[in-house]
A protein has these predicted regions:
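Extended non-catalytic accessory segments flanking core domains
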Residues: 1-206
Length: 207
């Protein structure tokens, strides 16, 4: 498979590649992670032509039952140009796309429903640039450096388990798929990742 796209982020073993202009279908992602196996020789804003097989990668192996991510294994790549504009991020929040608020995947993967199923929603933006609008932390930074947030300071989550203290509680019919994990991926960020408390307001977060 061959694609020509713009590099949006570089990791230690690959990079993220996204179409400058999407196809207009909100059910499908316009980006993919390109696996190189070692530090790639590309930079953010490079336009890349890359070829290789498409694979489903299971973090930790298939025996872990972790959910897979789609990746392109880089067999050949060419830098076509540099300094290109990055694709506009998808807004996650009230002024863009709203995440589902109750269901993760009630149909056991039999129906692809990104409007109502949290699992399908996040697959539809997999590997893409996104902005979590007016994010608020619903848990303190954990020992792995991860921060869990909701958009719009939880305004849309108030009826979906947001407590007075700012934590997000589950219920028998509400598993809060709107909770978004922000992770400091080694080598991507050029600043110190913050340590936050519940209720911290982070503003718009793009990644």
């Amino acid at each position: 498979y061959v694609v020509t796209r713009v590099v949006t982020a570089v990791d230690s073993n690959g990079f993220y590649l996204q179409a400058p202009i999407g196809d207009g279908d909100v059910a499908t992602s316009d980006a993919v992670f390109v696996f190189t196996g070692s530090s790639p020789s590309v930079a953010v804003a490079d336009a890349i032509a890359v070829s290789g097989p498409v694979q489903e990668f299971f973090p930790g192996g298939t025996g872990t039952r972790n959910l897979p991510t789609t990746q392109l294994r880089s067999d050949e790549l060419e830098v076509c140009s540099s300094g290109n504009a990055l694709p506009a991020p998808v807004i996650l929040g009230s002024s863009g796309r709203s995440t589902p608020f109750t269901d993760i995947d009630p149909d056991a993967l039999t129906v692809f429903d990104p409007v109502n199923d949290g699992l399908d929603f996040f697959e539809s933006v997999e590997a893409m640039r996104v902005t979590v609008e007016d994010a608020a932390a619903v848990a303190p930074t954990n020992r792995f450096g991860e921060i869990f947030v909701v958009a719009n300071q939880g305004a849309a989550s108030a009826a979906s388990g947001l407590s007075e203290r700012g934590t997000l509680n589950i219920a028998p019919v509400d598993f809060n798929p709107e909770k978004i994990q922000i992770d400091e991926d080694t080598g991507i960020l050029d600043f110190d990742f913050p340590s936050v408390a519940v209720g911290a307001r982070l503003g718009d977060v793009t990644g």
